[in-house]
UniProtKB/Swiss-Prot annotation:
Protein interaction domain: annotated span: 1150-1249
Keyword Magnesium: yes
GO molecular function: damaged DNA binding; deoxycytidyl transferase activity; DNA-directed DNA polymerase activity; metal ion binding
CDD domains reported in the protein's UniProt record: BRCT_Rev1, PolY_Rev1, Rev1_C, Rev1_UBM2
Name of the molecule in the record: DNA repair protein REV1
Effect the entry attributes to changing E571A: Abolishes transferase activity
Domain notes for this protein: The C-terminal domain is necessary for protein interactions.
Source species: Homo sapiens (Human)
Alphabetized PROSITE patterns for the sequence: BRCT, UMUC
GO terms under biological process: DNA replication; error-free translesion synthesis; error-prone translesion synthesis; response to UV
Family, as annotated: Belongs to the DNA polymerase type-Y family.
Gene coding for it: REV1
Length: 1251
């Protein structure tokens, strides 16, 4: 159709022209807006924005939809389409330079203007909230506001400091009566007088539960109108959430600025050293210079009086070093004395951790878990608490008052699962003021405060630069570039604008509910909190009291039951099903009794939530807080869960919340409309299933009383400043000693060591915004796997220094150091008999076969990315061990040992060769062991020719076998080798040495499977004795002659491995598998579906059957892709004189090119698909052997460079396995994919993209 004809007809459509259509559309939208506004108004409306018409450009927070609702409620207009004549204000948070030029002269305002106008109850001036000024021609200044004049009375972000100085009494009164929170927008540091810093810090730390480093966000106050206020820890009831919802969006935008608060609580001491008094004096002097009346503005800080500091009476120190701290130095020093400022100090680490809140919490959790475990082990079945409950039962009333105040008749107790979640209210605060009645009911915070909340701005520090960096990082979802410092730093700004102090970044560990109602949150910086609430009372840490109360809490719970899961020092999960059945009490009665006893014992309040599972119990606790209880009954679950935000679900963080929001999902009710298939498509099979179940209140997680320790670590990223390499080295050794102490305390040893270093990012300020903090950093990590697990500080320290030297860092830029130890094993076990991962005895599974579910219990917990080693084995007469740089991890697709007789017990053979044995007690320097038959079968001349270390191991194994033979007669040898082989460790070389032969002098050398002569390392060959060199040359000549006269016998090679003397037996415990060029296997092991087809397939010819041991070893170790295409050299078999081997004789001249990769004989893709579909759909629990065959097939495809078919096979398996109702199939697919990706990474340096 021609365009002209279309236009001609369009002109007759009733709209005349395109402009007419748009005008009609805009008019319709305006009418719709007015009609919606009339319905939205419900008594909370106003006319604040009368005459204001906004247009939202781009992403804002609150969102455009939220702003539209706000304009409806408060008399404004919302334009979907921008009109230069009608739109009065453009709302935006970020605009490109071209758009700024296009909108030059228009009012482009940040959304905080709307939010704060509503909070103020009147229309504020838009000037402090302009996104850019008319003088700005580029976007570099978008983050700043124009400087407000000191006489400007508007309560915008530029003059909060002036309000605090001139109208403190008015503000405090207003905060107490209206719960109003003054939240700043972004502002320039180039402001007058004391305004310098308030605009920066008032936005920070408004996110619930975040521990940050003083980085604000311009939209920190804009989540006020999203209809829900998630509390900082889910502790507030609905009626308690009366504070404007300033913080929900800030919780998404506020950056997790510092890992130091996550790893160790630096703010517990602020690491104030000998300069502490100088800093406080400087703060006092600068405050007095800038505002002589400031001391009168803050009622908590009189300078010369007998005052209450932290609620206790203290005489203010007279003299120049006295401070106005809300926490006296003398009082604080008792709880947290000063910590050395230099990491080179010998007491730095111990003092640091002794004052770290999070370190104490972590240690307490471990101690409480062990406490519960000890109670369970020593339990005699007597619970004093239950006896009290039984007595209470006899006199209890038939009615009970619920937490809502309703009277309800007690129902007969049910015996269904019932979980109770106990959580102390404002734990640190409650403990801190339990003996301080004068502080109860007042806003209180636990922190290591800094006086009035201000500290000097150190030269070189640039908080705005750090803030901008983290803002970009959060918004972009990745690390941002460092902004140009020239745009942020003004060398004269500090002196010209009076910016010589900043707000304190001492973190608030916990705050009371009275403080939370005023906008203060856990994790907020103390300086910011003091601006929100000048009457905020600070309480110092008291770790001894916290531990005492935590112990009392758990002892109280243990008096009722030992089925307790220690969540934290102030939180526990209890399975009360048995208690209710025994005492005949209702959940509400039991919860009330527990709460009352906890309060009597600790003088602290606890909230209790009860549900049928852990998820519901936790959600019920949110509703119960503070100091309440709530029983979420099964019949109420559906209605209750629908109204819960998805952010309340476990595992839903900022990233997942954003993704769910993009799908239009905010509540669990919205999430219930999503099918599991769609959720799994969007979030993956496991996460999708989790969301599908959690949003319906389904949770099958048990109350776990014991938890396996996976790692031990020690990190410090506060106060790290080095000037010399030797200082860093000494610190690493000291930290290694700390690791040793922790390993010894947990009774574990570790094998995998990781060194983590935080290095100042290029371009970042040398002086950080937080005193002693790490600032903007890059994280660098190195990992090494030791031969044996250790807890020795010297070994750990040596490994750390080696890795540290490879990093080649600028010492002065180091900001954090951490050591992690993984692959833990118990200390009380012999390392040689305890592998680095759990072992599963084959006897645990019938007939030597078991499901992959059992295997994953072993393999899933620990993955090993081994230190790079390359090993060439030297055994008998021509294999020599030479170490290189790659450790081998083997995947055993089939048994490595094959009985000679078909009558041999298959189950026994499989059970002994499934790679899941406990390792032998002797290990070589490369974590390899040599297995030998009984001493009578050894050839002493061969033994003497072995390297000393290898010979020593063989002798030790013989000694062990002789010791065992006295108590247990060995089974009849097969192939000249004992079938009762000792258990194997990872990467075991099985050396089967035949009996000495009296005839055929060349038989000994011919029995060793030689590599192709081209594969022999000339240096290794030259190092051999001359006599041995001659024998090898003769063996190669003989093999060449035999190869010329022999014929191919494919059937024999298919059923029997060509090298019965040397097998690589791999432990299946290694999850990461290396690529195998040649693999020896047994088709007679287990008659699984894939193996059945394998046996009946004429194409069944194992590639490993015709490869030499050297080829086999290289295929496992080198991972260098397929070798040259010339046929592999065949093994020269002369076994007639070897007892037990005559039945295995075959004289192939040489192997032809290996057949195409096949899966149980299926080569074509359609045949493979059919076989896979039959396998997955007919079996509910896949066998280990089947999975390993699939892994081998995939690795063969990689060797053949047939990646296209590999991609199709992997994706087809994924579809089939994810459709299976058995979750074990998903685990099986993950196992297969992990191994394939490892081989791909090693071969091609990349992985397969599986969507």
């Amino acid at each position: 159709m021609r365009r002209g004809g279309w236009r001609k007809r369009a002109e007759n459509d009733g709209w005349e022209t395109w402009g007419g259509y748009m005008a009609a559309k805009v008019q319709k939208l305006e009418e719709q807006f007015r009609s919606d506004a009339a319905m939205q108004k419900d008594g909370t409306s106003s006319t604040i924005f009368s005459g204001v018409a906004i247009y939202v450009n781009g992403y804002t927070d609150p969102s455009a939809e939220e702003l539209r609702k706000l304009m409806m409620l408060h008399g404004g207009q919302y334009h979907v389409y921008y009109s230069r004549s009608k739109t009065t204000h453009i709302i935006a948070t970020n605009l490109p330079n071209a758009k700024i030029k296009e909108l030059k002269g228009e009012k482009v305002i940040r959304p905080e203007w709307i939010v704060e106008s509503i909070k103020a109850g009147r229309l504020l001036s838009y000037i402090p909230y302009q996104l850019y000024t008319k003088q700005s021609s580029v976007q570099k200044g978008l983050s700043f506001n124009p400087v407000c004049r000191p006489e400007d009375p508007l309560p915008g972000p530029s003059n909060i400091a002036k309000q605090l100085n001139n109208r403190v009494n008015h503000i405090v009164k207003k905060i107490e009566t209206e719960n109003e929170v003054k939240v700043n927008g972004m502002n320039s540091w180039n402001e007058e007088d004391e305004n310098n810093d308030f605009s920066f810090v008032d936005l920070e730390q408004t996110s619930p539960g975040r521990k940050q480093n003083g980085i604000p966000h311009p939209r920190g106050s804009t989540a006020i109108f999203n209809g829900h206020t998630p509390s900082s820890n889910g502790a507030l009831k609905t009626q308690d959430c009366l504070v404007p919802m300033v913080n929900s969006v800030a919780s998404r935008l506020s950056p997790a600025f510092s890992q130091e608060e996550d790893k160790a609580e630096k703010s517990s001491t602020d690491f104030r050293d000998c300069t502490l008094q100088q800093l406080q004096q400087s703060t006092r002097n600068t405050d007095a210079l800038r505002n002589p009346h400031r001391t009168n503005s803050f009622s908590l800080s009189p300078l010369h009086s007998n005052t209450k500091i932290n609620g206790a009476h203290h005489s203010t120190v007279q003299g120049p070093s006295s401070t106005k701290s809300t926490s006296s130095v003398s009082t604080f020093s008792k709880a947290a004395p000063s910590v050395p400022s230099k990491p080179s100090d010998c007491n730095f680490i111990s003092n640091f951790y002794s004052h770290s809140r999070l370190h104490h919490i972590s240690m307490w959790k471990c101690e409480l878990t062990e406490f519960v475990n000890t109670l369970q082990r020593q339990s005699n079945g007597i619970f004093p608490g239950r006896e009290k409950l039984k007595k209470m039962k006899t006199g209890r009333s038939a009615l009970v008052v619920t937490d809502t105040g309703d009277m309800s008749v007690l129902n007969s107790p049910r015996h269904q699962s019932c979980i109770m979640h106990v959580d102390m209210d404002c734990f640190f605060v409650s403990v801190g003021i339990r003996n301080r009645p004068d502080l109860k009911g007042k806003p209180v915070a636990v922190t290591s405060n800094r006086g009035t909340g201000r500290a000097p701005l150190r030269p070189g520090a640039n908080p705005q630069l750090e803030w901008q960096y983290y803002q970009n990082k959060i918004l972009k979802g990745k690390a941002a570039d460092i902004p140009d410092s020239s745009l942020w730093e003004n060398p004269d700004s500090a002196q010209a604008n009076g910016i010589d102090s900043v707000l304190s970044r001492a973190e608030i560990a916990s705050c009371s509910y009275e403080a939370r109602q005023l906008g203060i949150k856990n994790g907020m910086f103390f300086g910011h909190a003091k601006q929100l609430c000048p009457n905020l009372q600070a309480v110092p840490y008291d770790f001894h009291a916290y531990k005492e109360v935590a112990q009392t809490l758990y002892e109280t719970l243990a008096s009722y039951t030992h089925n307790i899961e220690a969540v934290s020092c102030d939180e526990a999960l209890v399975d009360i099903t048995e208690i209710l059945a025994e005492t005949k009490l209702t959940p509400d009665e039991f919860a009330n009794a527990v709460r009352m006893e906890i309060k009597d014992q600790t003088k602290c309040a606890a909230s209790v939530g009860i549900g049928s599972n852990i998820l519901l119990a936790r959600m019920a606790t949110r509703k119960a807080k503070p100091d309440g209880q709530y029983h979420l009954k099964p019949e109420e679950v559906d209605d209750f869960i629908r109204g819960q935000l998805v952010t309340n679900l476990p595992g839903v963080g900022h990233s997942m919340e954003s993704k769910l929001a993009s799908l239009g999902i905010k509540t669990c009710g919205d999430l219930q409309y999503m099918t599991m298939a769609k959720l799994q498509k969007e979030f993956g099979p496991k996460t999708g299933q989790m969301l599908y179940r959690f949003c319906r209140g389904l949770d099958d997680r048990p109350v776990r009383t014991e938890k396996e320790r996976k790692s031990v670590s020690a990190e410090i990223n506060y106060g790290i400043r080095f000037t010399q390499p030797k200082e860093a080295e000494a610190f690493l050794l000291s930290l290694s000693e700390e690791i040793q102490r922790r390993l010894e305390a947990t009774g574990m040893k570790g094998k995998r060591l990781t060194l983590k270093i935080m290095v100042r990012k290029p371009g970042a300020p040398v002086e950080t915004a937080k005193f002693g903090g790490h600032g903007i950093c890059d994280n660098i990590a190195r990992t090494v796997t030791l031969d044996q697990a250790t807890d020795n500080a010297k070994i750990i320290g040596k490994a750390m220094l080696n890795m540290f030297h490879t990093m080649k860092l600028n010492i002065s830029d180091m900001r954090g150091v951490g050591i992690h130890v993984n692959q833990l094993v118990p200390t009380n076990l012999n390392p040689s008999t305890c592998p680095s991962r759990p072992s599963v005895q084959s006897s645990h599974f019938p007939s030597g076969s078991y499901s992959v579910r059992d295997v994953f219990q072993v393999q899933k917990a620990k993955k090993s990315t081994e230190e790079e080693h390359k090993e060439v084995f030297r055994a008998a007469v021509d294999l020599e061990i030479s170490s290189a740089s790659r450790t081998c991890t083997f995947l055993p697709p089939f048994p490595a040992h094959l009985p000679t007789s078909p009558d041999t017990n298959k189950a026994e053979s499989s059970g002994k060769w499934n790679g899941l044995h406990t390792p032998v007690s002797v290990q070589s320097r490369l974590n390899l062991s040599i297995e030998v038959p009984s001493p009578s079968q050894l050839d002493q001349s061969v033994l003497e020719a072995l390297p000393p270390d290898l010979r020593e191991q063989v002798e030790q194994v013989c000694a062990v076998q002789q010791a065992e033979s006295h108590g247990d007669k060995k089974k009849e040898p097969v192939n000249g080798c004992n079938t009762g082989i000792l258990p194997q460790p990872v990467g075991t070389v099985l050396l089967q040495i035949p009996e000495p032969q009296e005839s055929n002098s060349d038989a000994g050398i011919n029995l060793i499977a030689l590599p192709a002569f081209s594969q022999v390392d000339p240096e290794v060959f030259a190092a051999l004795p001359a006599e041995l060199q001659r024998e090898l040359k003769a063996a190669y000549d003989q093999r060449q002659r035999q190869g010329e006269n022999s014929t191919h016998q494919q059937s024999a090679s298919a059923s029997v491995p060509k090298n019965p003397l040397l097998h690589l037996k791999a432990a299946v415990k290694e999850k990461k598998r290396n690529k195998k060029k040649k693999t020896i296997g047994s088709p007679k092991r287990i008659q699984s579906p894939l193996n059945n087809k394998l046996l009946n397939s004429p194409a069944k010819t194992l590639p490993g059957a015709c490869g030499s041991p050297q080829k086999l070893i290289d295929g496992f170790l080198k991972h260098e892709g397929p070798p040259a295409e010339k046929p592999l050299e065949e093994l020269s078999a002369s076994t007639s004189g070897v007892p037990g081997l005559s039945s295995l004789q075959s004289d192939p001249a040489g192997c032809v090119r290996p057949p195409a990769p096949n899966l149980a004989g299926a080569v074509e893709f359609n045949d493979v698909k059919t076989l896979l579909r039959e396998w997955i759909t007919t079996i509910s629990d896949p066998m280990e052997e089947d999975i390993l065959q699939v892994v081998k097939y995939c690795t063969d495809l990689i060797e053949e460079k047939d990646l296209e078919k590999l991609d199709l096979v992997i994706k087809y398996m994924k579809r089939l396995m994810q459709q299976s109702v058995e979750s074990v199939w998903n685990m099986a697919f993950d196992f297969i994919l992990d191994n394939v990706q490892v081989v791909l990474q090693q071969t091609y340096g990349s992985t397969l993209k599986v969507t």
